[in-house]
């Protein structure tokens, strides 16, 4: 038992602390976003700044660029949510969730797939990037999914579940163990986020229907 504890302690001592800080802040962002808290965006801003450097250092260039984009979207997301959230409350009850139809998402996915293939080809042939196609696919779809979060679109969580599952393989291959663990947790939190937002969406839909009946 003592040997196991010593081995575990030694393992955590060797972990890259910059990655651990980024991991914890990213986890805070996802949990806060799932709960509808405006404070998710400051956590996102700091974590993405750290991950921009971390991914560049291991030649996951598209992931590095993606986190640079996240950095900007953290500012935009905070601004968008603050317009539609009571700053005194800042909780999930203040969220106004929307849902976009399946046809719209199918068209978006087809366009994003074409874009990802084109960018993947460029990354494979003109950069030293590892896993250029998978890295590009997760990046392109994550860009889109992040925009959906800022617009409070219910289906964003379904995109994140798929993106996070693909990312788990990518980070295992690059030996980014803390980040791999983080993305396993992300899959769970994204599932929770979808069900949480679905309830809020259904609740707001009932309110709108009731309002329409009482105010013809």
Language-model region placement:
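Short, strongly hydrophobic alpha-helical membrane anchors
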Residues: 1-17
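Hydrophobic, membrane-inserted alpha-helices
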Residues: 22-29, 46-52, 140-145, 161-169
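Membrane-helix interface "capping/anchor" motifs
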Residues: 31-42, 147-159
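C-terminal transmembrane-bundle signature of multipass membrane proteins
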Residues: 156-161, 166, 171-174, 178-209
């Amino acid at each position: 038992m003592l040997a196991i504890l010593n081995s575990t302690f030694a393992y955590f001592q060797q972990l890259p602390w910059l990655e651990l800080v980024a991991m914890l802040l990213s986890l805070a962002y996802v949990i806060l976003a799932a709960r509808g808290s405006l404070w998710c965006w400051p956590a996102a801003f700091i974590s993405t700044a750290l991950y921009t450097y971390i991914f560049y250092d291991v030649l996951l260039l598209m992931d590095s660029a993606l986190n640079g984009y996240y950095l900007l979207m953290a500012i935009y997301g905070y601004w968008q949510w603050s317009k539609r959230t009571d700053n005194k409350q800042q909780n999930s009850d203040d969220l106004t969730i929307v849902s976009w139809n399946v046809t719209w998402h199918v068209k978006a996915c087809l366009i994003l797939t074409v874009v990802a293939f084109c960018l993947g080809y460029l990354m494979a042939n003109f950069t030293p990037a590892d896993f250029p196609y998978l890295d590009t696919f997760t990046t392109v779809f994550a860009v889109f999914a992040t925009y959906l979060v800022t617009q409070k679109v219910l289906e964003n969580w379904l995109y994140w579940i798929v993106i996070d599952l693909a990312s788990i393989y990518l980070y295992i291959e690059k030996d980014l163990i803390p980040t791999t663990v983080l993305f396993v947790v992300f899959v769970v939190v994204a599932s929770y986020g979808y069900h949480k937002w679905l309830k809020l969406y259904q609740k707001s839909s009932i309110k709108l229907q009731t309002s329409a009946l009482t105010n013809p």
